[in-house]
Design a protein with these regions (language model features):
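Bacterial N-terminal signal peptides that target proteins for export
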Residues: 1-8
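Extracellular glycan-interacting surfaces
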Residues: 8-12, 18-339
């Protein structure tokens, strides 16, 4: 499947006729994906990596620059033509839907792993990177490190999320645990101690007090008080890495975990019990990331350098959904203007 480089503004306009005759989705799905199976330096294979947008007909279109190192993307809720990516060479920003880009960080902030626009103050952007946490209060023009309360050793930060219901509350997943800030990242306190890196932290779309987290090899956890304390999911294995966790926005009891070792793990009772949901997926079940479509409840799973797969019954059966040869680093569902 060929992928085209198309500016986002033009891309959205071109989709309107397709949307009219296709499924009326209220969310657009973006993925950050490296589509580079079998590629080596010097190879003549053409790859198209970076940000991809699912079209109304189910096909995928490339948006912006060709970069296999884009780990995450976050949009300005006031203007979806403005968004930020976390990539190998720093935090990048576009203000014209991906037509042009600017690296906004300097030499001392590289290889960020996650980026998050503050929904309470969209001029503020948070960045998780190997050296800790950085914040911009001017839409990425300048960055300040905000690490008070983080340890000198163990502040490598993999993921960062802003509490959508509490202004100033942020949760960060670091190599030494989960840290909570209640003052716009001016200070941090540890609320979960782990011996391995916290790979993902997510807030429930149903109850803002509920958060879930997964780790490199220290299991998975749930918080029912806004991240102030955590309890382990007893039935989730902890011997190997868990890459991410996703809530089902259409069903409060459903959660899914993606793991390179265990494949897809699913719960339909709020995390009390978990089952592998790999039947029908190619072996080995090397799941890179999972996501859940807020329009349909469709479970999505990225098989490392294989393809994207989808399930309409939360993992009991699967079918291929494109992006051959890809490894998806993140799923982002963005409310669209047709909502």
């Amino acid at each position: 499947m060929s992928l085209k480089f198309i500016p986002l503004a033009a891309l959205l306009a071109s989709f309107l006729p397709l949307i009219a005759i296709g499924q009326d989705r209220t969310y657009d799905l973006y993925v950050c994906a490296a589509v580079n199976r079998n590629y080596v330096i010097g190879s003549k294979i053409t790859t198209t990596s970076g940000l991809h947008l699912r079209q109304a007909n189910g096909q995928w279109a490339h948006v912006g620059i060709n970069d296999p190192s884009i780990f995450a993307v976050s949009f300005d809720p006031r203007d979806h033509n403005t968004f930020y990516t976390a990539a190998l060479n720093g935090a990048l920003r576009t203000v014209n839907g991906g037509d042009s880009w600017r690296v906004t960080t300097s030499w001392d902030i590289t290889e960020p792993k996650d980026v998050c626009v503050d929904p309470h103050n969209p001029d503020r952007v948070y960045l998780a990177h190997p050296g800790g946490i950085a914040v911009s209060d001017d839409r990425g023009m300048t960055w300040t490190k905000r690490e008070r309360g983080l340890p000198d050793r163990g502040k490598y930060t993999q993921t960062i999320e802003v509490d959508r219901s509490r202004k100033g509350h942020i949760l960060a997943g670091c190599e030494s645990g989960i840290y909570l800030s209640q003052n716009d990242a001016r200070s941090w306190r540890k609320t979960l101690v782990t011996e391995e890196t916290v790979n993902d932290v997510q807030q429930s779309p149903h109850d803002p007090d509920i958060w879930a987290a997964v780790t490199q090899s220290a299991g998975a956890y749930i918080s029912r008080n806004g991240g102030r304390s955590w309890t382990a999911f007893d039935q989730v294995p902890s011997e190997a890495a868990l890459y991410n966790i996703a809530f089902d926005p259409t069903n409060p009891g459903r959660l899914a975990i993606g793991s390179y070792t265990y494949g897809v793990l699913a719960s339909e009772d709020g995390g009390a019990t978990w089952k592998p949901r790999n039947e029908g997926l190619p072996k080995p079940h090397r799941i890179w990331r999972v996501g859940v479509d807020p329009d349909s409840g469709t479970l999505l799973a990225s098989l490392y350098q294989k393809a994207l797969y989808e399930s309409s019954d939360f993992g009991k059966t699967w079918k291929k959904a494109g992006l051959e040869g890809s490894a998806i680093n993140s799923f982002v569902f963005l409310p669209n203007s047709r909502k």
